[in-house]
Amino acid sequence: MEFIVSLLLLSPALVAGSLHSRIDNGLARTPQMGWNSYNYYSCSPNEAIIRSNAKALVDLGLAELGYRYVTTDCGWSVADRLPNGTLTWNETLFPSGFPAMGEYLHELGLLFGVYGDSGTKLCGSPPDQVGSLYHEEQDAKTFAEWGADSLKYDNCYSDAATNYPNVNYEPSTSPRPRYEIMSSALARVGRPILFQICEWGIDFPALWAPALGNSWRIGNDIIPAWRSIFRTLNQAVPNTDFAGPGQWADLDMLYVGNGVFSLPEEQTHFSLWAILKSPLTIGAALKDDDTSISQASLEVLKQKDVIGFNQDALGVSASLKRRWSDEGYEVWSGPLSGNRTVVAVINWRNESRDLTLDLPDVGLQYAQVARNIWGKTVVRDVRTSYTAGVAGHGTILLELQGTLPSGLYPAKIFAKSTGQRSTFESIYAATTSANYELAITFSRPSTETVTITTSSGQTVSISGKSGRIALTAGSNTITIQHKTPIESIQITPPTGTYYANTVFNVTGSAKHTTCGSGCSPVGSKIGYLSPTSNAYTSISTTTAGSKYLAIDYINNEVAFSSSWGWGSNSRNLTVSVNDGAPVRLEVPLSGRHSELYSPGKGWWDTATLGVLTSGWKKGENKVVFGNEGGEDGFQTYAADFVGVRVLD
């Protein structure tokens, strides 16, 4: 399975984000944490609201956990500047003024966050509030003079060519130059100010924002609806490897505590934001004259293990490992310091059930300790798989310690030995194949011939230390007759055979397209797969059974305007074998270039996800890729199809 995990993680399009230049202002070495007024109070903050919620950060024990940046979002300013051109605050809403607000926050041991806009007006106008466009140098100095510690910088009223509309998701030019100007201005004020780029994911900012700011919003606003969690995670997929110390992909503010989500939904929301290393910005009313956060939601925000995953010194985001669209769950995972691993199994169905994590799906075979964070349980000696109950829309969040890489089976952990017979259990096979490579490590040098029997019914003799065996997709046992004691075995899955889209025939609207560049590894793809069209070919396999397919796809259907409704940043893709029931995969975004200005507009960027398919016969098999069910609430067209690797 190690090969498969590497295949999925090192897709040709997924080059390291660390290759790009990065700002180094000494801030946000771990993701910033704090509170922002927008999610609950919208653009109607006032001094009493900000002060009471800031005080609550301290009183509720949140500040000591790291929630320190307090930001007054839109609604604080006025339509005009002072006669000298300086920004000012709404004196009715903030009678003490912003410098006094900064002093108050600093006295509490908190940090003062201000909000501005790269356009002519702030978001939330009217009533009009002046923005920073063409006044960046002056405004940066003003923020510094007020004692600001961070600036959230928005993107409304910013496109000159279209007369500065409130929102333009397809601006005439990239937002980048406006953010470069403010970034440079902040660098010259002589005060460290954390810079939060908030241009809603336009022009794929992961390629340029890390050079300018400490975080960048990956997409449009989170909305008070459960579906926005799926939409946001789909947009996060191509962003995760750009994150690192000093620069973080911002999934937007938290809705935990606003009475929008159930408790399991809040746990899922908080867990995924944390392990993807998003800034953790509370968007709830913690305490004001009318409202206070519930104890249950407060406990979610204060969960120290989850905060620890977010603030981990290694600074590596979790990434999507595998998705089961028909079954309604998926797995995310990433490394932590101390050779630990964090894993999240999301239950997208709104029903309680047991879900199983196969450790090889996250590159592991064994964990000495598995800590279930929300389940508050600890399991030791986890071999190959872990099963737990999870609530509807909840998440199994695990910290794995003392792990071994996938494919490695030490005898003392996996084998039961009697005399010269050892039976290894919990042997994982991602696919049914007679081409698994078995390597034996003996306790001392040996050239003996051993006899191996697998649970698939195969018996083979191997001379030396390695040979091929047959395994069936799922859990297997291997019995070895031997004279020399065995220390461990190593099993490597088949590399399989790659079938490019060019060997597939197309029907209906589907058509082959040559890419100007990209579309790795073949330089072409099949697009326009409607619910009434498909791509088909015949593929020969050496064994019957279930086969693992690593599918190369492209999707850059970015949800901007549609994000307020049912936009999901996903596209449907189905595969069927020998006219069997199709397996559906709702793929996330793969685009890693600008959706507006790059030559391919992100539609040349390949990503890979795997599925297990049944119904394969020995010999020739009819394989069909399509968009079955695409008419039922999905995008008109399927994800573009580049090719597929069949592990046989």
Swiss-Prot record:
The keyword Glycoprotein applies. Keywords: Carbohydrate metabolism, Disulfide bond, Glycoprotein, Glycosidase, Hydrolase, Polysaccharide degradation, Secreted, Signal. It is found in: Secreted. Glycans are attached at N84, N90, N339, N350, N505, N572. Its main location: secreted. The keyword Cell cycle does not apply. The active site is at D154, D221. Disulfide bonds join C123-C156. It catalyses: Hydrolysis of terminal, non-reducing alpha-D-galactose residues in alpha-D-galactosides, including galactose oligosaccharides, galactomannans and galactolipids. GO terms for cellular component: extracellular region. It holds the Pfam family Melibiase_C. Its EC number is 3.2.1.22. InterPro entries: Aldolase_TIM, Glyco_hydro_27, Glyco_hydro_b, Glycoside_hydrolase_SF, Melibiase_C. It comes from the Eukaryota. GO terms for molecular function: alpha-galactosidase activity. Substrate binds at E199, W200, G201, I202, D203. Transmembrane segments: none annotated. Residues 1-16 form the signal peptide. GO terms for biological process: polysaccharide catabolic process. Belongs to the glycosyl hydrolase 27 family. Hydrolyzes a variety of simple alpha-D-galactoside as well as more complex molecules such as oligosaccharides and polysaccharides. This is Probable alpha-galactosidase D. It comes from Aspergillus fumigatus (strain ATCC MYA-4609 / CBS 101355 / FGSC A1100 / Af293) (Neosartorya fumigata). The gene is aglD.
